[in-house]
């Protein structure tokens, strides 16, 4: 971004007192205080004081960064479905000589110090930023700063800055400087000054498209860079691979246009390309014209890729049998608990002690909402109130002792309602020191509270330059204390969009397939473990450490695609098992886990589809219902092309015939059914498909199944109640995935088998070390 600097003759007016009197203002935006990346700098706070004045603070260093006339463009994945972009400012600077550097003096000498962001608070329509300066002697000086737009007697625009200091030790002076001028704050008191600027009559307009090819502009404004990169395969092929494989003739271009608009699979492996019906044919042709300019002299096979050779057969499949489910699980009733005009992209979901639901939203509002009467399921009785706004991509939420904590992209924040009006007055920073850059993919997911600590997951950056490195905190689970201190528990993760409590008060996460992750995972968090993503390995190691095995491998597009938050089932027929959602494939999967040789392992079952959008967050309410928060990104991370959803599933008592559990045994496996298998059915071992393989992590997106083989069942024993099957299988290998596919059996009550497949991760075989 380029801002025009205005040469000024500033008038600085000093005063030594300040007030908190009401100061009604006509703010230019409904949400006028906004956390985000800004102009490629993380941890920024933009304040829209007036149409004539925006200010931005670097909250990482607690300093005023810029004052300008213009505005802010909220662009990017959460705002405009453009993953490769981030918010930028536009307009013209009032000054480039701001007093924006802190100084500490002790007995006339400069003192070492560091500054800590403590958040901000709204009082009487003014914003008060809170900082703490820790001196070399560990004194903690508290500072409040309140900026406001004013005009001088001559009509010139100005910025008023009010300060309040406390806990300043004797002999210590706190001041602001720009290298030439200083302003000393009154110790343990109030201070203020106003800077007047020359008016800006014609601020620089919003930035125009910067790319030199219209096709690239269209791609940046769409979601193309979510799944594709220029020279390396990601979810889909690289643009260079496309340019090398296809000729730029009318027949081929017509087919590619159709593929982009309608979606499909099979050309580049198992990954499904989502359709883009919103794109016009002319726009797609312009994009393709740009892609063909990327053609190289390399052969297609020399471009980094990971095309799968084990495509699933399309024949002899039906919903739940070799293919995804289509409808709602028969044992549950589904209710949509939002009105049509409320469209939340749910980033976090929890409940208050009084039963009200709390959600955070991954959108341009960055909101937190209190939703009442959700247990009724009646949208005429359900009420929604915005509790907070302006948060930066809040993808985690937790309620602790009735207090709301939210995990933003760059900060763990406590939201405080001081006056009881159900609107947050204070956004208190608990932790904002973990590593972060401006990369769009550095998501922070969460949030779980356990025994005095919060647990959150950090996503890897995906658009670093060749001379840049991943920050040490990325691709990790962090344990964060109430005092803001944190430690890294496990590392080597990629995009761990899900964390929650599991059996025995343990913590489980999900991670998404990609580079060095041949399939998605359900992982039991054990301190110190490395989980395979080599971008996050310790630089001092010449070789990566051994990769810890997940509790469950989740085969891409067979079982899941973009797994999200897991949740432990508290009651009912699936008590003690876990469920997890899927943002891209949609629906919910069920996870049965058991402990073998002291470690968790288990299997995945398809559970339900029939929901309004991809599933991002899950939480059980006091009424026993499963509450479902949906989220989608146009084109890339979405199910059915929809971006929002809020529903609940309530158990209705209707039995469903399905596999309840698969347990590893010394002889093979035990399969437990929810109902008796019909006595009219002959259990034929040759009709049950058993396969095994292991996954090879590679630098490419995903990874191949290695040593894929079909296994034979030597013998089947069935219990007298026809609910338990004991499968005696030779040739099983540890650290392999075992695939099961049953025939389309029916139960003794003539119910059809809901789903025939399961995938078991056999890390250990009982009875073997």
State what each model feature region is.
Residues 221-231, 273, 287, 291, ...:
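The canonical Cys-X-X-Cys-His
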Residues 275-303, 731:
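C-terminal capping alpha-helices of c-type cytochrome domains
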Residues 19-144, 158:
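Beta-strand-rich N-terminal accessory domains
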Residues 299-662, 679:
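Beta-propeller domains with acidic blade repeats across secreted/periplasmic ectodomains
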Residues 210-230, 244:
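Sequence/structural segment immediately N-terminal to covalent heme-attachment motifs in c-type
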Residues 676-715, 740-748, 756-759:
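Short, surface-exposed alpha-helix to beta-strand junction/turn motifs within ectodomains of secreted
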Residues 124-128, 132-160, 652-679:
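Surface beta-strand/loop "capping" patches
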């Amino acid at each position: 971004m380029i801002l025009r600097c205005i040469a000024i003759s500033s008038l600085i007016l000093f005063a030594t007192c300040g007030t908190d009197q009401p100061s009604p203002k006509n703010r230019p935006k409904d949400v006028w205080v906004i956390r985000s990346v800004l102009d490629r700098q993380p941890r920024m706070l933009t304040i829209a004081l007036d149409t004539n004045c925006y200010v931005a603070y670097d909250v990482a260093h607690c300093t005023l960064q810029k004052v300008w006339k213009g505005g802010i463009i909220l662009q990017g994945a959460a705002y405009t479905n453009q993953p490769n972009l981030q918010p930028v400012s536009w307009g013209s600077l009032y000054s480039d000589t701001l007093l924006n550097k802190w100084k500490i003096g002790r007995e006339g000498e400069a003192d070492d110090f560091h500054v800590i962001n403590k958040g901000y608070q709204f009082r009487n329509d003014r914003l008060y930023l809170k900082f703490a300066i820790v001196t070399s002697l560990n004194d903690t000086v508290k500072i409040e700063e309140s900026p406001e737009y004013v005009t001088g007697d001559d009509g010139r625009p100005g910025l008023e800055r009010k300060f309040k200091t406390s806990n300043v030790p004797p002999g210590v002076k706190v001041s602001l400087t720009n290298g030439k001028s200083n302003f000393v704050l009154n110790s343990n008191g109030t201070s203020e000054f106003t800077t007047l600027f020359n008016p800006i009559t014609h601020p620089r307009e919003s930035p125009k498209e910067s790319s030199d090819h219209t096709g690239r502009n269209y791609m940046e404004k769409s979601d193309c860079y979510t799944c594709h990169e220029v020279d390396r395969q990601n979810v889909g092929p690289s643009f260079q691979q496309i340019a090398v494989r296809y000729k730029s003739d009318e027949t081929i271009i017509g087919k590619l246009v159709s593929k982009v608009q309608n979606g499909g699979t099979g050309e580049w492996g198992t990954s499904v390309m989502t359709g883009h019906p919103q794109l016009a044919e002319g726009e797609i042709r312009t994009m393709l014209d740009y892609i063909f300019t990327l053609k190289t002299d390399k052969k297609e096979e020399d471009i980094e890729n990971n095309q799968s050779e084990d495509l699933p057969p399309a024949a002899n499949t039906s919903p739940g049998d070799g293919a995804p489910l289509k409808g709602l699980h028969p044992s549950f009733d589904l209710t949509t608990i939002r009105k049509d005009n409320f469209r939340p992209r749910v980033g976090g979901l929890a409940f208050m002690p009084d039963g009200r639901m709390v959600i955070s939203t991954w959108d341009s509002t960055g909101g937190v909402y209190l939703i009442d009467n959700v247990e009724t399921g009646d949208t005429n009785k359900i009420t929604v109130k915005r509790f907070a706004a302006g948060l930066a991509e809040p993808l985690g939420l937790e309620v602790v002792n009735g207090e709301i904590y939210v995990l933003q992209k760059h900060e763990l924040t406590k939201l405080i309602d001081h006056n009881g009006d159900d609107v947050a007055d204070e956004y208190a920073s608990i932790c904002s020191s973990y590593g972060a850059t401006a990369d769009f993919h550095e998501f922070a997911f969460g949030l779980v509270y356990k025994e005095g600590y919060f647990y959150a997951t950090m996503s890897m950056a995906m658009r670093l330059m060749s001379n840049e490195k991943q920050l040490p905190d990325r691709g990790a689970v962090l344990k964060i204390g109430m005092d803001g201190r944190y430690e890294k528990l496990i590392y080597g993760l990629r995009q761990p969009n899900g964390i929650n409590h599991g059996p025995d008060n343990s913590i489980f996460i999900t991670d998404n397939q990609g580079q060095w992750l041949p399939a998605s995972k359900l992982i039991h968090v054990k301190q110190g473990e490395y989980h395979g993503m080599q971008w996050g390995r310790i630089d001092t190691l010449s070789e990566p450490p051994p990769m810890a095995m997940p509790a469950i491998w989740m085969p891409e597009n067979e079982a899941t695609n973009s797994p999200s938050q897991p949740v432990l089932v508290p009651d009912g027929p699936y008590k003690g098992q876990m469920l997890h959602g899927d943002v891209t494939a949609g629906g919910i999967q069920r996870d049965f886990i058991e402990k073998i040789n002291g470690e968790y392992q288990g299997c995945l079952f398809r559970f339900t589809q029939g929901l309004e959008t991809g599933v991002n967050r899950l939480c059980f309410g006091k009424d026993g219902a499963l509450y479902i928060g949906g989220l989608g990104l146009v084109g890339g991370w979405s199910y059915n092309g929809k971006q929002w959803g809020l529903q609940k599933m309530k158990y209705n008592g209707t039995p469903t015939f399905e596999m309840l559990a698969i347990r590893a045994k010394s002889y093979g496996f035990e399969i437990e059914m929810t109902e008796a298998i019909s006595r009219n059915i002959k259990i034929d071992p040759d009709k049950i498909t058993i396969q095994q393989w292991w996954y090879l992590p590679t630098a490419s997106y995903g990874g191949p199944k290695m040593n894929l083989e079909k296994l034979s069942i030597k013998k089947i024993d069935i219990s007298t109640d026809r609910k338990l099957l004991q499968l005696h299988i030779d040739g099983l290998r540890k650290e392999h995935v075992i695939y099961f596919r049953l025939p389309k059996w029916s139960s003794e009550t003539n119910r059809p088998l809901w789903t025939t497949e399961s995938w078991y991760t056999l890390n250990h075989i009982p009875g073997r070390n």
